[in-house]
């Protein structure tokens, strides 16, 4: 019932006898439920009665699996414990989100820059613009490859068109990333310098100077970098990464000291770090930037599921909530600068959340995860990862995260997002324990749906 998801075990000491994978996955799920109940002060069954019921059943199945007479019985009981445990942890995560969401927005409305989306600069504002009216802000990707396809020849046609549209409509803009070394980000003529930073640094600076000078008065927040810590374009010394970020940061401050700056991190789960040489974890990277004295106003986090790239594969709601909890206590506000799920299956390894990915399943995921994220008091805003499919294609080779078709036709997730944003334009009122709620409409801002 949970789908095809990435799960984990507890840290296991080496031993001669092989571990039973299903049993250890169930053990970790039991541990996660207990740990988060303690962390969130959710031990009272009245806060999440369905979660408590499923946990008790999962614990009984796990206990029986530990003393099962044979491996077949153990496997069946462990599988049942995993299934029930997944239900329990997801229900706990959503119950906790419901409480915090009402605590945060019970007496006040959400800010005027709560919900955004990422557009594809190659699309036509006249066609896509009307579908952006319900969103508070817009992220405009800036790709060096498209702006300077020939060295020294800059083409700002697409960016000018969208920045003009944003100015005319009064939409706040997040622009960037300015520094991006991922595959396909560099112009063809600059690829020969990919691993020669001394030669790449000057043309990179020239590009940054052109972009920042042109748009400094029109951009509300600059996304300086996105996922540089993962070294997806090949190994790169951290000193070069820091130098590139510092160059962009100082250039922005030189033109406008009050300009807001953001650093975006990818793969909060550490999948890429374990696979790609030279990569470091998102949280370690942020600590390193702080130690180097780099200044930025916000942290951006990419939270993608259903993709084929490590760090974007399907995961359960509790894992997503727990990953966001790791930002608690950071002095910088958090933006979910790219949050999304696909509307179709993207291939082997992408997984699925319950049923296969479809437009309706994408909408159901959004109705759960967006309220869950906004319930975190340190989350400042959320941007959907792709307004149309080609805005931020899955690095694994496919695209399908859009909430609007290329011709401007909305998908079901679009309606869910607009409905949630509309709901947060007025106070939610006090939280009422489960069982005392009147029937809720599907996909309301509190995260309850007919799912």
Residue ranges and their predicted role:
Residues 137-150, 160-270, 341-343:
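Substrate-binding cleft and catalytic face of glycoside hydrolase catalytic domains
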Residues 200, 214, 228, 232-247, ...:
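Aromatic-rich peripheral "rim/lid" segments of glycoside hydrolase catalytic domains that contact
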Residues 58, 64-122, 129-130:
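Long amphipathic alpha-helical scaffold segments
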Residues 2-60:
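Amphipathic, heptad-repeat alpha-helical segments
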């Amino acid at each position: 019932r949970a789908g095809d998801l990435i799960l984990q075990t507890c840290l296991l000491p080496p031993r001669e006898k092989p571990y039973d994978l299903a049993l250890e996955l169930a053990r970790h799920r039991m541990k996660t439920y207990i740990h988060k109940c303690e962390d969130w002060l959710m031990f009272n069954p009245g806060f999440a009665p369905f979660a408590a019921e499923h946990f008790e059943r999962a614990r009984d199945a796990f206990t029986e699996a530990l003393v099962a007479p044979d491996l077949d019985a153990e496997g069946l009981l462990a599988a049942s414990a995993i299934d029930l445990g997944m239900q329990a942890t997801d229900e706990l995560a959503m119950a906790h989100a419901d409480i915090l969401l009402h605590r945060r927005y019970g007496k006040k409305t959400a800010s005027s820059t709560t919900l955004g989306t990422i557009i594809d600069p190659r699309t036509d504002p006249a066609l896509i613009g009307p579908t952006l009216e319900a969103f508070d802000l817009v992220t405009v990707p800036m790709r060096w490859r498209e702006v300077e396809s020939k060295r020294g020849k800059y083409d700002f046609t697409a960016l000018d068109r969208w920045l003009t549209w944003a100015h005319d409509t009064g939409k706040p803009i997040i622009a960037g990333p300015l520094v991006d070394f991922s595959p396909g980000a560099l112009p063809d003529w600059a690829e020969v310098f990919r691993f020669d930073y001394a030669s790449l640094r000057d043309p990179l600076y020239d590009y940054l100077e052109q972009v920042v000078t042109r748009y400094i008065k029109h951009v509300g927040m600059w996304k300086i970098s996105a996922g540089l810590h993962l070294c997806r374009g090949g190994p790169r010394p951290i000193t070069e990464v820091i130098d590139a970020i510092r160059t962009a940061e100082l250039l922005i401050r030189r033109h406008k000291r009050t300009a807001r700056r953001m650093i975006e991190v990818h793969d909060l789960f550490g999948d890429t770090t374990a696979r790609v040489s030279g990569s470091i974890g998102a949280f370690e990277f942020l600590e390193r930037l702080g130690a180097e004295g780099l200044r930025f106003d916000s942290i951006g986090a990419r939270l993608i599921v259903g993709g084929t790239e490590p760090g974007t594969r399907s995961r359960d709601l509790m894992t997503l909530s727990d990953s966001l909890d790791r930002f608690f206590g950071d002095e910088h506000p958090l933006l979910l600068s790219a949050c999304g799920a696909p509307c179709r299956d993207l291939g082997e390894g992408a997984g699925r959340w319950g049923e296969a990915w479809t437009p309706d399943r994408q909408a159901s995921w959004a109705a759960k995860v967006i309220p869950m994220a906004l319930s975190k008091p340190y989350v400042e805003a959320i941007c959907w990862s792709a307004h149309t499919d080609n805005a931020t294609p899955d690095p694994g080779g496919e695209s399908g995260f859009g909430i609007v078709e290329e011709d401007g036709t909305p998908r079901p997730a679009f309606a869910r997002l607009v409905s949630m944003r509309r709901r947060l334009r007025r106070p939610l009122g006090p939280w009422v324990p489960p069982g005392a709620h009147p029937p809720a409409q599907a996909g309301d801002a509190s995260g309850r749906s007919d799912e």
